Amino acid sequence: MKIEHYQMLAMRTSQEGHDRILNGCMGLIGETGEIVDIVKKWKFQSGDHAELPKDKLIDECGDVLWYCAELSTGLDTSMAKLYIKKNHLFDDMTKIHKTAPLEITVMRLAAMSLRPTMFLFDGIPEQTTRNIGVDYLEAQAKAEIVGIMSTVRDILEIHCSTSLTDAMEHNIEKLRRRYPDGFDPERSLHRIE
């Protein structure tokens, strides 16, 4: 699945008429927290020989990607263009992720998920925003989306033996089952998996 196709399909389940930037930022923080929780439970609560719950990790990585799509759409940009344009900057990050334990990588992911919020919502005084420029702040948030996507890609490839695009397809199939006619708040509250 191509990233631009994923973004279009993912937004089929986005709720109309809400603040996509705020929802995207909050969702990234929440979903990366779920990834951290999966790894924490695997590492510290499952015993020495427990197998990493890769299916759960893939599910949550897909949810992080959904919120990347939501935030990108809110910023009126293409995930694919961001990812292709900036991905070469993250080659060194991938080298680190290949040697770092998974728990360190997911903590980095969680820290990255906070940064778009910092750039877009941290209560920067209006005068400062005018001086720095909204375009600069949005550019920083877009760079963080790429960092998040690159880190998710590395988690998927290194620790789950799957690709970013496979996780995107998995996420879209999950959303089609959950919301066959598009987003429905009632189905969101009373999920049947």
Please describe what each predicted stretch is.
Residues M1-E193:
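Flexible "arm" and connector segments at domain edges
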